[in-house]
Amino acid sequence: MVTIEQLFRQAQQAGAAEIYLMAGRKPAARIGGKIKNLDYPELSSTEAEKILLEMLDAKQAAQYRETKSVDEVIAFHGIGRFRVHIYQNDGVPSACVKIINKKEGLPEELKALAGITQGLVLVCGKPHSGKSATLAALAEQMLAGRFMHLVTLESPVEYPIEAGKGLLSRRCIGKDTGSYKEGMDNLLHESADGVLIGELETPEAVQAALRAVKMGLVVLGTVNSVDADTAVERIAQLSGMEAPLQKTRVWKMTKAVI
Protein backbone atom coordinates (compact mmCIF):
# COMPACT_ATOMS: atom_id res chain seq x y z
CA MET A 1 0.00 0.00 0.00
CA VAL A 2 1.16 3.52 -0.76
CA THR A 3 2.62 5.48 2.15
CA ILE A 4 2.06 9.14 2.93
CA GLU A 5 5.81 9.78 2.91
CA GLN A 6 6.12 8.37 -0.63
CA LEU A 7 3.21 10.43 -1.90
CA PHE A 8 4.38 13.65 -0.31
CA ARG A 9 7.95 13.21 -1.53
CA GLN A 10 6.89 12.56 -5.13
CA ALA A 11 4.47 15.50 -5.15
CA GLN A 12 7.05 17.87 -3.72
CA GLN A 13 9.71 16.74 -6.20
CA ALA A 14 7.21 17.35 -9.01
CA GLY A 15 6.79 20.97 -7.87
CA ALA A 16 3.25 20.53 -6.55
CA ALA A 17 1.48 23.19 -4.50
CA GLU A 18 -1.21 20.85 -3.17
CA ILE A 19 -2.05 17.16 -2.96
CA TYR A 20 -5.57 15.66 -3.14
CA LEU A 21 -6.41 12.27 -1.62
CA MET A 22 -9.86 10.75 -2.16
CA ALA A 23 -11.29 7.24 -2.10
CA GLY A 24 -11.97 5.85 -5.56
CA ARG A 25 -9.51 8.25 -7.22
CA LYS A 26 -5.80 8.25 -7.92
CA PRO A 27 -3.82 10.61 -5.68
CA ALA A 28 -3.59 13.95 -7.50
CA ALA A 29 -1.57 17.14 -7.19
CA ARG A 30 -1.87 20.74 -8.35
CA ILE A 31 1.24 21.39 -10.44
CA GLY A 32 1.68 24.65 -12.34
CA GLY A 33 -1.90 25.59 -11.51
CA LYS A 34 -3.38 22.39 -12.96
CA ILE A 35 -4.54 19.23 -11.17
CA LYS A 36 -2.78 16.10 -12.41
CA ASN A 37 -2.92 12.46 -11.32
CA LEU A 38 0.17 11.08 -9.61
CA ASP A 39 1.63 7.74 -10.66
CA TYR A 40 -0.22 5.69 -8.04
CA PRO A 41 -3.27 3.39 -8.17
CA GLU A 42 -6.70 4.47 -6.99
CA LEU A 43 -7.19 4.56 -3.24
CA SER A 44 -9.83 2.23 -1.86
CA SER A 45 -12.08 3.48 0.95
CA THR A 46 -10.14 1.31 3.40
CA GLU A 47 -6.77 2.64 2.21
CA ALA A 48 -7.92 6.27 2.31
CA GLU A 49 -9.24 5.92 5.84
CA LYS A 50 -6.13 4.09 7.04
CA ILE A 51 -3.44 6.41 5.66
CA LEU A 52 -5.28 9.62 6.54
CA LEU A 53 -6.48 8.83 10.05
CA GLU A 54 -3.08 7.40 10.97
CA MET A 55 -1.74 10.96 10.73
CA LEU A 56 -3.99 12.11 13.58
CA ASP A 57 -3.24 11.96 17.27
CA ALA A 58 -5.97 10.98 19.74
CA LYS A 59 -7.24 14.55 20.21
CA GLN A 60 -7.34 15.25 16.48
CA ALA A 61 -9.08 11.93 15.81
CA ALA A 62 -11.73 12.83 18.39
CA GLN A 63 -12.19 16.22 16.72
CA TYR A 64 -12.59 14.56 13.33
CA ARG A 65 -15.22 12.16 14.68
CA GLU A 66 -17.13 15.10 16.15
CA THR A 67 -16.86 17.75 13.41
CA LYS A 68 -15.99 15.61 10.35
CA SER A 69 -12.96 17.79 9.58
CA VAL A 70 -9.59 18.63 11.11
CA ASP A 71 -6.50 20.69 10.23
CA GLU A 72 -2.94 19.89 11.20
CA VAL A 73 0.65 20.53 10.14
CA ILE A 74 2.96 17.54 9.86
CA ALA A 75 6.65 17.28 9.02
CA PHE A 76 8.74 14.49 7.55
CA HIS A 77 12.50 14.58 7.96
CA GLY A 78 14.19 15.11 4.62
CA ILE A 79 10.89 15.89 2.89
CA GLY A 80 9.31 18.98 4.44
CA ARG A 81 6.25 20.43 6.17
CA PHE A 82 2.66 19.97 5.04
CA ARG A 83 -0.63 21.52 6.10
CA VAL A 84 -3.23 18.75 6.02
CA HIS A 85 -7.00 19.33 5.91
CA ILE A 86 -8.87 16.05 6.42
CA TYR A 87 -12.62 16.10 5.82
CA GLN A 88 -15.44 13.62 5.37
CA ASN A 89 -16.47 13.03 1.76
CA ASP A 90 -19.43 10.69 1.13
CA GLY A 91 -18.78 9.00 4.46
CA VAL A 92 -15.04 8.46 3.89
CA PRO A 93 -12.05 10.63 4.89
CA SER A 94 -10.49 12.74 2.11
CA ALA A 95 -7.67 15.26 2.31
CA CYS A 96 -6.33 18.41 0.71
CA VAL A 97 -2.67 18.91 1.58
CA LYS A 98 -0.81 22.19 1.17
CA ILE A 99 2.94 21.85 0.69
CA ILE A 100 4.66 24.39 2.92
CA ASN A 101 7.66 25.46 0.90
CA LYS A 102 10.71 26.95 2.57
CA LYS A 103 9.98 30.62 3.18
CA GLU A 104 12.23 33.22 1.62
CA GLY A 105 13.38 36.45 3.21
CA LEU A 106 11.25 39.58 3.01
CA PRO A 107 11.82 41.61 -0.20
CA GLU A 108 13.89 44.74 0.37
CA GLU A 109 10.99 47.06 -0.49
CA LEU A 110 8.88 45.56 2.31
CA LYS A 111 11.46 45.58 5.10
CA ALA A 112 10.42 49.06 6.28
CA LEU A 113 7.08 47.56 7.32
CA ALA A 114 8.90 45.69 10.08
CA GLY A 115 9.20 49.03 11.87
CA ILE A 116 5.42 49.38 12.36
CA THR A 117 4.61 49.22 16.08
CA GLN A 118 0.83 49.68 16.14
CA GLY A 119 -2.09 48.98 13.82
CA LEU A 120 -3.20 46.40 11.29
CA VAL A 121 -0.82 44.97 8.67
CA LEU A 122 -2.58 42.77 6.11
CA VAL A 123 -1.13 40.34 3.58
CA CYS A 124 -3.72 39.75 0.87
CA GLY A 125 -3.84 37.59 -2.23
CA LYS A 126 -5.52 34.64 -3.88
CA PRO A 127 -5.30 31.16 -2.35
CA HIS A 128 -1.88 29.51 -2.93
CA SER A 129 -0.21 32.90 -3.56
CA GLY A 130 2.27 32.71 -0.65
CA LYS A 131 0.46 34.85 1.92
CA SER A 132 1.43 32.71 4.91
CA ALA A 133 5.10 32.65 3.86
CA THR A 134 5.14 36.44 3.47
CA LEU A 135 3.46 36.88 6.85
CA ALA A 136 6.03 34.65 8.56
CA ALA A 137 8.90 36.49 6.84
CA LEU A 138 7.50 39.84 8.02
CA ALA A 139 7.15 38.57 11.59
CA GLU A 140 10.71 37.26 11.49
CA GLN A 141 11.99 40.61 10.19
CA MET A 142 10.23 42.42 13.04
CA LEU A 143 11.73 40.10 15.65
CA ALA A 144 15.19 40.34 14.09
CA GLY A 145 15.25 44.12 14.35
CA ARG A 146 13.98 44.91 17.82
CA PHE A 147 13.24 43.62 21.29
CA MET A 148 9.53 42.78 21.35
CA HIS A 149 7.16 40.01 22.40
CA LEU A 150 5.14 38.63 19.50
CA VAL A 151 2.31 36.19 20.20
CA THR A 152 0.81 34.16 17.37
CA LEU A 153 -2.73 32.77 17.28
CA GLU A 154 -2.80 30.20 14.48
CA SER A 155 -4.91 27.26 13.36
CA PRO A 156 -2.66 25.41 12.70
CA VAL A 157 0.94 26.70 13.04
CA GLU A 158 2.48 26.60 9.54
CA TYR A 159 5.88 28.24 8.99
CA PRO A 160 8.76 28.25 11.48
CA ILE A 161 9.71 31.76 12.67
CA GLU A 162 13.06 32.72 14.20
CA ALA A 163 12.73 34.85 17.34
CA GLY A 164 15.86 36.94 16.63
CA LYS A 165 16.26 39.68 19.25
CA GLY A 166 12.67 39.32 20.38
CA LEU A 167 10.47 36.85 22.22
CA LEU A 168 8.05 34.61 20.33
CA SER A 169 5.05 32.75 21.79
CA ARG A 170 3.29 30.47 19.29
CA ARG A 171 -0.23 29.48 20.27
CA CYS A 172 -2.23 26.98 18.24
CA ILE A 173 -6.02 27.29 18.52
CA GLY A 174 -7.40 24.15 20.15
CA LYS A 175 -4.00 23.06 21.44
CA ASP A 176 -2.48 26.01 23.32
CA THR A 177 -5.62 28.12 23.72
CA GLY A 178 -9.30 27.32 23.33
CA SER A 179 -10.23 30.05 20.85
CA TYR A 180 -9.15 33.36 19.32
CA LYS A 181 -11.17 35.19 21.98
CA GLU A 182 -9.50 33.24 24.78
CA GLY A 183 -6.09 33.90 23.24
CA MET A 184 -6.89 37.61 23.06
CA ASP A 185 -8.08 37.66 26.68
CA ASN A 186 -4.60 36.48 27.67
CA LEU A 187 -2.55 38.94 25.60
CA LEU A 188 -2.38 41.63 28.26
CA HIS A 189 -1.28 39.09 30.86
CA GLU A 190 1.44 38.00 28.43
CA SER A 191 2.61 41.62 27.95
CA ALA A 192 2.57 41.26 24.16
CA ASP A 193 3.72 44.00 21.78
CA GLY A 194 2.24 42.36 18.72
CA VAL A 195 0.08 39.48 17.57
CA LEU A 196 0.08 37.40 14.40
CA ILE A 197 -3.32 35.94 13.51
CA GLY A 198 -2.80 33.51 10.66
CA GLU A 199 -6.08 33.83 8.77
CA LEU A 200 -8.58 36.68 9.15
CA GLU A 201 -11.47 34.75 7.63
CA THR A 202 -13.98 34.41 10.49
CA PRO A 203 -15.80 36.98 12.65
CA GLU A 204 -14.03 35.61 15.74
CA ALA A 205 -10.55 36.03 14.22
CA VAL A 206 -11.29 39.50 12.80
CA GLN A 207 -12.83 40.78 16.01
CA ALA A 208 -9.82 39.47 17.94
CA ALA A 209 -7.49 41.32 15.54
CA LEU A 210 -9.34 44.63 15.81
CA ARG A 211 -9.50 44.30 19.57
CA ALA A 212 -5.70 43.91 19.64
CA VAL A 213 -5.28 47.04 17.50
CA LYS A 214 -7.43 48.98 19.98
CA MET A 215 -5.11 47.72 22.73
CA GLY A 216 -2.23 49.44 20.92
CA LEU A 217 -0.60 46.36 19.41
CA VAL A 218 0.68 45.72 15.91
CA VAL A 219 -1.42 42.97 14.32
CA LEU A 220 -0.34 40.84 11.35
CA GLY A 221 -2.80 38.72 9.37
CA THR A 222 -3.74 37.31 5.97
CA VAL A 223 -6.90 37.87 3.93
CA ASN A 224 -8.08 36.04 0.82
CA SER A 225 -8.63 39.00 -1.52
CA VAL A 226 -7.33 40.36 -4.80
CA ASP A 227 -6.45 43.90 -3.67
CA ALA A 228 -6.21 46.23 -0.68
CA ASP A 229 -9.71 47.67 -0.96
CA THR A 230 -11.31 44.23 -1.13
CA ALA A 231 -9.21 43.09 1.84
CA VAL A 232 -10.36 45.99 4.00
CA GLU A 233 -13.96 45.50 2.87
CA ARG A 234 -13.74 41.83 3.86
CA ILE A 235 -12.39 42.74 7.31
CA ALA A 236 -15.14 45.34 7.71
CA GLN A 237 -17.87 42.84 6.86
CA LEU A 238 -16.61 40.40 9.52
CA SER A 239 -15.91 43.06 12.14
CA GLY A 240 -19.28 43.29 13.83
CA MET A 241 -19.16 47.10 13.60
CA GLU A 242 -22.19 49.14 12.58
CA ALA A 243 -22.48 49.08 8.78
CA PRO A 244 -22.20 52.83 7.95
CA LEU A 245 -18.78 53.18 9.61
CA GLN A 246 -17.29 49.71 9.10
CA LYS A 247 -14.93 50.35 6.21
CA THR A 248 -13.82 53.82 7.34
CA ARG A 249 -12.88 52.55 10.79
CA VAL A 250 -10.97 49.57 9.43
CA TRP A 251 -9.02 51.79 7.02
CA LYS A 252 -8.04 54.06 9.94
CA MET A 253 -6.72 51.03 11.83
CA THR A 254 -4.81 49.70 8.81
CA LYS A 255 -1.15 50.71 8.47
CA ALA A 256 -0.21 48.60 5.44
CA VAL A 257 -1.62 46.09 2.95
CA ILE A 258 0.77 43.83 1.07
Predicted ranges, named:
Residues 1-258:
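Short, flexible helix-loop junctions that flank or precede catalytic/ligand sites
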